[in-house]
């Protein structure tokens, strides 16, 4: 069976996108891992699947799978690519698109300049909602890894995030420490780990180790998490430019109880077919 797909990326965070509205495709975790391989497959950070909506008030259901085959509840960069894909493929002609994920709902808006803004979920700080093991909600937690003890913030953006403030992202041990913290026992579902360098209240540099993957060139939900944690720690303003290895995102947050707005580009690379 031949399956049509698109290869896309958001600031270098790359995706294989499947239309499951006009196709009927199921990929096992083993198949996803096979196709994610950059030497023997297509190569991608995550698989995005477009499905018909489960709610008549929504336009689509949005599913996300990591390169290891595990399903996750959120991907901000993927959401921008999702919006561009459904417009490009004629699945939707709206500028404002409403979708559900396994953990909530999102609004996607295609802007006049071609960028796409995503209304992300309201950040969740309560430990059991992240999930994170702690007796109470705090702005900063102490995490002890095998190599060192770090101070971090914890939040859910529809997926769990750990944010560590560093003096320099260039010198941060993203690969080793990021992997340790990602699978730390206090994150029962693992976590994405962001290393944040604060340049000014309106500008940060960020590198992210994604759970189930590794360091990526960009992470939209990670950018949102970093800004939210920085704001709650009274280090950042409401509107922040986030510089990632793959490019820049604009993040805006009004504070607790409000959703986070993220704006940035989405790029179509090529279309292809895979045999399953």
Curated annotation (Swiss-Prot):
Site for Important for dimerization, residues: 270
Record keywords, A-Z: Amino-acid biosynthesis, Cytoplasm, Isomerase, Lysine biosynthesis
Subcellular location: Cytoplasm
GO biological process: lysine biosynthetic process via diaminopimelate
Gene3D superfamilies on file: Diaminopimelate Epimerase, Chain A, domain 1
Protein's UniProt keywords contain Cytoplasm: yes
List of catalytic residues: 75, 219
PROSITE patterns, alphabetized: DAP_EPIMERASE
Gene Ontology terms, MF aspect: diaminopimelate epimerase activity
Residues where substrate binds: 13, 46, 66, 76-77, 159, 192, 210-211, 220-221
Known pathway: Amino-acid biosynthesis; L-lysine biosynthesis via DAP pathway; DL-2,6-diaminopimelate from LL-2,6-diaminopimelate: step 1/1
Superkingdom of the organism of origin: Bacteria
Pfam families linked to this entry: DAP_epimerase (PF01678)
EC top class named in words: isomerase
Site residues (Could be important to modulate the pK values of the two catalytic cysteine residues), renumbered to this chain: 161, 210
Family stated for the protein in its record: Belongs to the diaminopimelate epimerase family.
Biological role stated in the UniProt entry: Catalyzes the stereoinversion of LL-2,6-diaminopimelate (L,L-DAP) to meso-diaminopimelate (meso-DAP), a precursor of L-lysine and an essential component of the bacterial peptidoglycan.
Subunit record text: Homodimer.
NCBIfam families for the chain: DapF
Record protein name field: Diaminopimelate epimerase
Origin species: Colwellia psychrerythraea (strain 34H / ATCC BAA-681) (Vibrio psychroerythus)
Gene symbol of the encoding locus: dapF
